[in-house]
Amino acid sequence: MANALRRFTEYAPANPDLMVALMLLLAVSMMVMPIPVMAVDALIGFNMGLAVLLLMAALYVSTPLDFSSLPGVILLSTVFRLALTVATTRLILAEGEAGSIIHTFGSFVISGNIVVGFVIFLVVTMVQFMVLAKGAERVAEVAARFTLDALPGKQMAIDAELRNGHIDADESRRRRAALEKESKLYGAMDGAMKFVKGDSIAGLVVICINMLGGISIGLLSKGMSFAQVLHHYTLLTIGDALISQIPALLLSITAATMVTRVTGASKLNLGEDIANQLTASTRALRLAACVLVAMGFVPGFPLPVFFMLAAVFAAASFVKGDVLDADKVDATTVTPAESQTPNVAAQPNPIGVFLAPSLTNAIDQVELRQHIARISQLVSADLGIIVPPIPVDVDQQLPESQFRIDVEGVPVEQDLINPAQLSLADDLKKIESSGIPFRHDPETHRIWVEQSHEPALKAAGIRHHSPSELLAMRVHATLTCHAPRLVGIQETRQLLGRMEQEYSDLVKEVLRTTPIPRIADVLRRLLGEGIPIRNTRLVLEALAEWSEREQNVALLTEHVRSGMKRQICHRYGRHGVLPAFVMERETEDVVRCAVRETAAGPYLALEDRQSEALLSQMRQVFSSTAPGQTRPIVLTSMDVRRFVRGFLTRNGIELAVLSYQDLASDFKIQPVGSIRLPPSNGTSGEPRSIRPSATTG
C-alpha cells in the first residue's frame, strides 16, 4: 500500500492531464456504481481539501489572469461534488449509513436538535445562493460584457504604442495574448457562475429527496419507528447536505473573489491590497478608534472589548504614520552632489519672449500673457498645430525698452517698443479729423500717439493697440512664420494619435506606407507655405494614395496639396475668385532649364539678369496690392512651382505660388497679368516687368 501510494505521488505531478481525466472518470463512476463507506470518507475529505486549496489560490494570485483555469476548475469541482452527493445519497437510502464524516458532522451540527440543524443548513444555503452566487454571477456578467466592449479600444491602443515605438513586437504580442486570455476568462466565468448557482439549488432538492426517501424506506422496509427514522435519516441528510454545501460555499467565495478583483499596477495579492488600502489613511484609522471608544460607553456594551479594538486601530494608525514619514524623508533626502548638479540637459523653449528690465514694470505682464495665450489659440485654430506655452522672461542683457523673441533658443526678432505710445489701427484721415497729435512712421506705416491721449482716442472711437497688444502681434507673426519648427516627429505622433481615435483605419493605412519622419516632413512643407493642416484627414488620404507611388518628399507634398485644393483656394481667394499672375510657358521653360540636380537635391540656378527680372516683377506684384485687397497669387506648373516659391522666399517676398493642380473646380481664376522672363541665351531688349492681361480691362 505504501509503495503504491509513493508511486502515485511520483506519477501524478508529472501527468496532470491524466489526473484530470481520472477525476472525471471517477465522478462518472460514483454516479452509477456503489462506493464503499471508507472510500466515501476519503472522497469527502478530498472535496473539502480541494475547496480550501482553490480559495487559498484565489486569495494569493496577483491578477485574475494568474488563475485563468478557474472556470474549468469550477466545472470539474461541481461535477465531482454532485457525483459525490449521488454516492452519499445511495448509501443513505440503501444502507442507512454514509460514513463517519457525515455522521459526525451531522451529530455535531444538530447538537441533539433537528430543527437547529435544518435551520443552519437553510442559512448556509441561502447565504450561498442569494448573496454569494447571485452577486458573483452579476459581477461576472457585467465584467464579461465590459471586457468584450473594451477589447477593440485596447487592441487599437496596443497598435498605437507599437507604431509610436513605445513597445516592441514581442511586447505587443504578449499584451494581445493577455487581452485575449482576459476576454476568454471573464466570458468563461460568466458561464461558470451558473454552475455555482445551480449547485446551491441542487443542494436544496437533494436534502428534500434524502429526507422523504429515508423516512419512507425506514418506515416501510426496515420497520423502524417514526421517531427513530426521523432522527436517524435527518442526522444523515443534514450531515450530507452540509458536508456538500460547505465546499460549495468555499467555491462560491473563490469565484466571487476572482471576479471582484480590481488589479492595480502594484499587482499585490488580495490580502496585501486590502491591508494597504485600509491603512492608507491614518486619519481614517484614528477616527474609527474614536468611534469604537464611544461605542464602549453605550450602556450594556462590553467596554473592555471596544477599548481593546480601539487600541488596535490606534496602534495601527501610529505605525502606518511612522512608515509614511520615513518614506517622505527617504524621498526628499538627496546628497549634496545631487542638489548642486545643474540641469545641463534642459531643453530650450520652442518659443520664448524676453523683455528688457525697463519693460517689466512699464508693460502689464498679466495682460501681455493673456494676449499671447489668445494669439496662441488663434494660431493653433488657424494652422491646426499645437502651440506650446510661450514664457515671458526678463533678459538683463537687453538694452532699454527692447524685446527679443527666440525660436528654439535662437533670436529671430529683436526690436524697440515704446511703452508710452499707442499704435493706431484706423486710417489717417479719421485721426487727422480728431485733432489728436500723432506721429507717422513711413517705414512701418504705423501711426503713434502718446499714451496720455488714450481717453481721447476712446471718446473719438479710434481703434488702437497697447504695447502688450503690439508685442503679442509680433509673437503672432513669429508663430506664423516659424510654424514648421513647431512640428516634429513627436508632434506628428501626437497628431496621429488624436486622428486614430476617429480614423483608425486611415492612420493604419498611412503608417503602413509612410514613416512618421516623412509625414512630419510633408506637414512642415505645407506649413512653410502657410497651408493649414487643420483638416488632417485630407492630408492622410493623399498620403495613403500617393506615398507608395511617389518617393520624393517634395513631389509627394505637391500631390498632398492637390488633395487640399479647395482649402488652398479658399485661403487665397475671395467669393470664389482667385486673382492671379500667370507665369508664361516660355518663362516656365526658363525656370525648368535652370533647375540643377545635385546629390543634396535639385535647386534653381537662374542667371543674374533673369533673377533680377523675376524679382523686379514679383516686387511689383507684391507692392501693387492695396491694403484690404486680396493679394494675387502666382500661377505656374506643378514641376516648377516649388522652385519659384523657394526663390521668392529666399529673397524676402511672401507671395503664394500655386500650381494648376492646386485649383479647385468651384473657384474661378481672374488673370490680372502675366510673368515673363527673357530666355537664357537672349540678348536683345529689356525684359518686360508685367504684361497686363486683356481680361482685366
From Swiss-Prot:
TM stretches of this protein: 20-40, 42-62, 67-87, 107-127, 200-220, 235-255, 293-313, 372-392
Major location (coarse): membrane
Domain of life where this protein originates: Bacteria
One Pfam assignment: FHIPEP
GO cellular component, one term: plasma membrane
Compositional bias ranges of the Polar residues kind: 680-697
UniProt-listed PROSITE patterns: FHIPEP (PS00994)
Location in or out of the cell: Cell inner membrane
BP GO annotations: protein secretion
Stored PANTHER family: FLAGELLAR EXPORT PROTEIN, MEMBRANE FLHA SUBUNIT-RELATED, INVASION PROTEIN INVA
Similarity remark: Belongs to the FHIPEP (flagella/HR/invasion proteins export pore) family.
Function: Could be involved in the secretion of an unknown factor.
Entry protein name: Probable translocation protein y4yR
Organism: Sinorhizobium fredii (strain NBRC 101917 / NGR234)
Lineage: Bacteria, Pseudomonadati, Pseudomonadota, Alphaproteobacteria, Hyphomicrobiales
